[in-house]
């Protein structure tokens, strides 16, 4: 799944966002990770209740994240292939770390509201597969483009990688957004957003919790 995430960053997300395509590599343990690397570990069970995947800052401005397999598998998901996968959660975390590693960027919608720069959340329940040689298809997360955060973007623009969203600041039925409105931070869920995922958005270590408590 690391190779699928690397391909997604290099060929899809980084070019779309005008970012340098940072390497995504596998390490058997944190100790074997390259010096200075931002580590996203895949673990079986959450070390904090209701945490699906999160990343945060450690000392020295390094980013440290975790993805937990059990919540995905316990709710009908799979490891690599399907609509809900551990690889998709990893992809989601990698993508959002790429674009907003410090979880502090917001975009103004032109009407006084500010939307969190979380590129996976608005289309969180949508995924696609990348074929990895020797492994087969691996699920990765859909993500929104810079046009999604631009209130002046026209309807002819591409707002997400899979083309499911038709206007800026809109989410799919299985999406989620964090919005600052009149000085208050709010969370909005799509009509089919799973209840088990909602609880995880409130986990103390989630990106969403960091948004809503700062």
Give the ranges of each region predicted by the language model.
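Metalloprotease/metallohydrolase-associated module, dominated by Zn2+-dependent proteases
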Residues: 47-48, 55-63, 69-80, 84, ...
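Short, well-ordered secondary-structure micro-motifs within conserved domains or adaptor modules
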Residues: 23-55
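Short alpha-helix carrying the canonical HExxH Zn2+-binding catalytic motif
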Residues: 82-95
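Sec/Tat-exported extracytoplasmic proteins
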Residues: 9-17, 93-94, 98, 102
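Zn2+-dependent metallopeptidase catalytic core
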Residues: 1-24
């Amino acid at each position: 799944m690391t190779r699928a995430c690397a391909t997604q960053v290099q060929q899809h997300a980084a070019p779309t966002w005008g970012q340098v395509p940072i390497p995504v590599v596998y390490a058997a343990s944190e100790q074997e990770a390259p010096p200075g690397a931002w580590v996203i570990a895949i673990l079986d069970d959450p070390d904090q209740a209701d945490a699906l995947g999160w990343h945060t800052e450690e000392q020295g401005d390094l980013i440290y994240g975790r993805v937990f397999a059990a919540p995905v598998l316990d709710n009908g998901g799979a490891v690599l292939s399907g609509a809900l996968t551990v690889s998709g959660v990893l992809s989601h975390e990698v993508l959002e770390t790429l674009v907003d590693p410090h979880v502090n960027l917001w975009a103004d919608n032109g009407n006084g509201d500010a939307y969190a720069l979380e590129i996976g959340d608005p289309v969180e329940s949508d995924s696609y597969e990348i074929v990895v040689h020797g492994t087969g298809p691996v699920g990765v997360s859909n993500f929104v483009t810079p046009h999604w955060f631009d209130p002046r973007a026209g309807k002819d623009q591409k707002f997400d990688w899979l083309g499911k969203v038709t206007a800026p600041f809109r989410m799919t039925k299985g999406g989620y957004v964090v919005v600052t409105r009149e000085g208050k931070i709010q969370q909005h869920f799509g009509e089919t957003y799973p209840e088990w995922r909602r609880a995880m958005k409130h986990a103390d270590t989630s990106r969403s919790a960091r948004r809503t408590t700062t």
